[in-house]
C-alpha cells in the first residue's frame, strides 16, 4: 500500500437534506446550495437526448467520445486530436497527474483552491508547493517564483474555487511568458461560462503562443450535467497522445456523450441561464455587507468570516444548505427566492 495515502482522506460529502433536518430540527424544505450545481438544470434538449437513447444502455460507450470530440472541436475551433475527455474534471486531473508525475516531482499551485490538484500529486509521491492566496485570488507573482526547471506541473484555477476570484488576460499572459516552456501550466476554467468580466483571459488565443498552456473545462457547472460527469482538457497533440494511454477505455458513458452534445448545441439556453446567474449574483453585492464578500465571477459567493459555522447554521435555518470553510462560507447562487432569503440573513449577520 502506498504510504503517502496516510496523508490523505477520502472525500467526505455533506449531510443529506433529510439528515440535516433531523440533526437541526428543521421543518420545511431544504435547498442544496453547497456544491455549485446549476439549479436551473441542463438544457431540455439534453434531457431529450438522454430519453432518446435509453435503449442503448446495454452498449459500451464509444471509446474516446468521438462525436463529442468533433462537436467540441468545432465549437472551440481546435483540432480534435488536442482534446481528451474524462468523467468530470476530477478524472482529467487524475489522468494528467498519473501520466506526468513521478516520485519527487514538484507541482506548484495555490492554497485555498480546488483540492484535487494536491490530492492527486500526493498519490503520485510528488511534492506540493502551495502559495498563499492574495486577496482571495491566485498570487501569480509569487507562484512564478516557485516555478523552476524541476517543476512538473503548475495548476491554476480561474475563476478560483472556492473563492470565485479571477486573474485577467494580461496577468496570465505575463505569467506564461516567464514559465519555462517545458513546464505544463494547467488552467482550470470550470466556471468559464459564468464569467462576465471583459478582461478575462482568452486562453485558447494564448495557446497559439504558448504550447505549455493547457485548458480544462467541464459540463458539470453552467451546462448542468454534474450527474453525468463530462470534463475535458485542450492541450497539444503530443500531450493528449500520452495522456490518452492513461484514460480508461470507456470512461465517459454513451448517455453522457449524447447529453453533452445536445447541451453544447443549445447555446441559447446556456446564455439564458448564465444571464440569470449574473443578475442574481449582482444582488448579493448590492448590500453594504458585501464588503465581507470576495468578488465573484462564478455561480457562487464566498463570504469571509471567522464565524463560518454560525453563518452556515443561520443560512440553514432559512432552508439553505451552504458550504462552510475555515475562513468563510461558500454560497451557491440559487433561484431568486432562495437568494433573497440568504441575503436577508447576510444583512443582519455579525461578521
UniProtKB/Swiss-Prot annotation:
GO biological process: L-histidine biosynthetic process
Classification via CDD domains: AAT_like
Enzyme Commission designation: 2.6.1.9
Modified residues (N6-(pyridoxal phosphate)lysine): 221
Enzyme class: transferase
InterPro entries to which the protein is assigned, alphabetical: Aminotrans_II_pyridoxalP_BS, Aminotransferase_I/II_large, HisP_aminotrans, HistidinolP_aminotransfase, PyrdxlP-dep_Trfase, PyrdxlP-dep_Trfase_major, PyrdxlP-dep_Trfase_small
Entry superkingdom: Bacteria
Protein name: Histidinol-phosphate aminotransferase
Catalysed conversion reaction: L-histidinol phosphate + 2-oxoglutarate = 3-(imidazol-4-yl)-2-oxopropyl phosphate + L-glutamate
Keywords on record: Amino-acid biosynthesis, Aminotransferase, Histidine biosynthesis, Pyridoxal phosphate, Transferase
Alphabetized Pfam families for the sequence: Aminotran_1_2 (PF00155)
Keyword Amino-acid biosynthesis: yes
Spans through the membrane: none
Xref: PROSITE patterns: AA_TRANSFER_CLASS_2
The protein's assembly and partners: Homodimer.
Annotated signal peptide: none
GO MF annotations in UniProt: histidinol-phosphate transaminase activity; pyridoxal phosphate binding
